[in-house]
Amino acid sequence: MIRAENISSGEEQECGAILNWLLPATLLPVAAYAQEATVKEVHDAPAVRGSIIANMLQEHDNPFTLYPYDTNYLIYTYTSDLNKEAIRTYNWSENARKDEVKFQLSLAFPLWRGILGDNSVLGASYTQKSWWQLSNSKESAPFRETNYEPQLFLGFATDYRFAGWTLRDVEMGYNHDSNGRSDPTSRSWNRLYTRLMAENGNWLVEVKPWYVIGSTDDNPDITKYMGYYQLKIGYHLGEAVLSAKGQYNWNTGYGGAELGLSYPVTKHVRLYTQVYSGYGESLIDYNFNQTRVGVGVMLNDIF
């Protein structure tokens, strides 16, 4: 089957070193050939639907405006199986429940617009995903797992066209992902990644390959289950958005996939249904196979 701790000063230094490497080695060619997307002053929807970078290039009255990076949602879920073995050191593990509240918060901030031309931005993002045992009042409703995912990246808004598709986003950066736990439940990895997003009519396709760097002692076989890339597909059907994303290791046959459906109920809130099946829904479950179904609300979909 398609199977926090706070960031240390050492990790911050590593992030800076990686950025210094990324700029001259891989990003300047993109700056040289990408078509310019002029920074615009706007106060409404993004100029390019689904483009994270085009959205971040827009200027607002408030200089501290935060932008959505990934989706932001809250859903009530039920899983086919709970990974109690991974959390056996928690004193409440035997009483852990299969129903949980799952939510994701994902925001980005432009650090330097126009760093390599008007179509470029140096940005930072933070994504947090949590699994909350809200109904487990017997154990004081603990958080079973939380994943913290900061990124530092350089992005370009482009307008390249090929066979009906338009390449909208080119992004390269550094990603740290951890659950902020100490041993034996600590899970973390660091990656260099590239994200490419293209659109064609009502379709959106995004591919995000990565290269693992640094130590993975907490989870040495994580790529066996999480692979080396993520693929995301979206389709706009009227006001509804259908989405699918997943990762897969073709050598091992392990991976995981997430399906989503959202529909607006107000101007700012969407009804959201999500199904995840396979390995790697969270870091603590990277090598655990399950199917989880959830229903709730969403603030922003992929486009």
Task: Go through the PLM ranges and name each one.
Residues 1-57, 303:
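Cleavable N-terminal export/targeting peptides
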Residues 37-116, 133-136:
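Solvent-exposed N-terminal domain segments of exported/luminal and surface proteins
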Residues 80-90, 97-98, 112-235, 246, ...:
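Outer-membrane pore/translocation modules
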Residues 263-283:
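Long amphipathic alpha-helical scaffold regions
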